[in-house]
């Protein structure tokens, strides 16, 4: 707004300096619009506008509106001025004579002259003489100073380019009448002009580099005339000046474009923040709607209980009918005694085993209740999209000291902004709202380090595996509610069939796959909590294998593990199961038969990470390589090498995210093969574990920090 007012003031100043200062108009003072008469309303209004301290007040605008009729006439004549084609008619109008019109249109006020750029010489003259000297074509400046060119020189430098473009267009039109454009354009050395965008001609054209004279060094060497050499020298200098001016014009355009880009970037950042705030409010409202649904269900249950109580009370009001209905006969009394004695005998014989079965039934009922409760199924009406608008490599935030020691594993749900993390020493799984960097839950129950976890994408369930040989299933909603109340959470169900540390797990629909150091893989039915299949991985190669990995990094989470996991990673889909083991082999299983159907060989050390999609399986190993395999042909398609052992990886169709016990998390672009890092100058620790979903990357570091990035 300030710039607009400034420009308006300069415009009024320019017009008024002509209208007020003109001395050549003395006829018809009352009626002439450009008259100096103080009774002229237009002149009087302009004079007041320029001299008043508050020229933008309402009174001035009212006076301007009163002269609307005169201004309308001027507007019509102005349209006539700009519509004339001949030079003479350009200065012909109904308001004034040609001489006056020429003065008005060609006049430059002092304010406009002061805006012209000054050279060092003109600045010194201004200081000495108090006036501004304009840069002329013959002026020269010191080579160490940037040359500043006048507007006239800019026009003059553009004329050869414009003339050449016009000549080319005329040539095209003339030849187009004789032949087809497809035959003409190749002869001219140009491609057919297919306009796909406003900048295509600018990118392909070289007209701005055009030199008006063909300077042939061989021809210059053969010139015998000094005058001819001086003429060519002058032309060359002129062309050099013109090229310099064109270069300066192009540089000015670049600066202007940069400024526009900065402004657009600032606007984009503000809009992204606005979208992020909107999505937070959307998630909050969905939580409110979910809470209302829970309360409505509670009201329905309370109503049913009240109905049952009222029905029972109505029966108590008629005690005689109750006595008659409940009085047993002699035969019924005898049968009841026999039934009681039989039941007592059964209880005595099975009492020892009943204690063990009660807990299992309770867990089974808890699982059934969890999956039958519709509130535990994940659903969102509005999906988050803000991550699409961030630039790749942007660090969103850091959760400092999420745990006191190194992060062993983590997982997150980008649709609900929830993050689960585990540390090496605290044996607690923490639940976070990662957008606010706030802890919202804690899962306590394991008695050893948590080595693996997964957040179910369909239900509010978290599965965790530990070195205590157990797998625990948690209700995330219950965990959050108990944490807000200040109470400890309890696991929804515990799977304790493994005999040694659980090293990896994977949830696939209703199935849960778990791998252990006891050399077995178990398949569980999540709805019942029962083990339905066991895979034996006690292969001879695993027993004889010894890792060649050298202990060289004290911060490495891998080195804190006494033994390399026998089964480093697993993943399943439908009836297919993939396992990566410490002998460096990838085995593909058919779960319908329980047999290995393929073996992929290539890694020279233990496999720590593994994941596959419809066509590709990607594995990371302690040998410092990532290998990509084509599942359709079983062929190795690519090898990506790093300096240190791979501790974790994740990928999608575009990128592979890698943690290799180094300072930065690595990114590999699957489309162009480029490698780049998530640069974090504030951190001096190592990246140990990564998860990558929908452009979000979560990295767990050796000091317990969690980094949140966009890839």
From Swiss-Prot:
Membrane topology: Peripheral membrane protein
Pfam family, one: WD40
InterPro entries found in the cross-reference section: G-protein_beta_WD-40_rep (IPR020472), WD40/YVTN_repeat-like_dom_sf (IPR015943), WD40_repeat_CS (IPR019775), WD40_repeat_dom_sf (IPR036322), WD40_rpt (IPR001680)
UniProt region (Disordered), positions on chain: 116-139
Transmembrane regions: none
Principal localisation: mitochondrion
Location relative to the cell: Mitochondrion outer membrane
Annotated keywords: Coiled coil, Membrane, Mitochondrion, Mitochondrion outer membrane, Repeat, WD repeat
WD repeats mapped onto the chain: 402-442, 445-484, 497-536, 560-601, 602-639, 641-680, 682-711
Signal peptide from the UniProt entry: none
Coiled coil spans: 224-281
Gene Ontology CC: mitochondrial outer membrane; transferase complex
Biological function: Involved in mitochondrial fission. Has a partially redundant function to CAF4 in acting as an adapter protein required to form mitochondrial fission complexes. Formation of these complexes is required to promote constriction and fission of the mitochondrial compartment at a late step in mitochondrial division.
Family: Belongs to the WD repeat MDV1/CAF4 family.
UniProt protein name: Mitochondrial division protein 1
Organism from which the protein derives: Candida glabrata (strain ATCC 2001 / BCRC 20586 / JCM 3761 / NBRC 0622 / NRRL Y-65 / CBS 138) (Yeast)
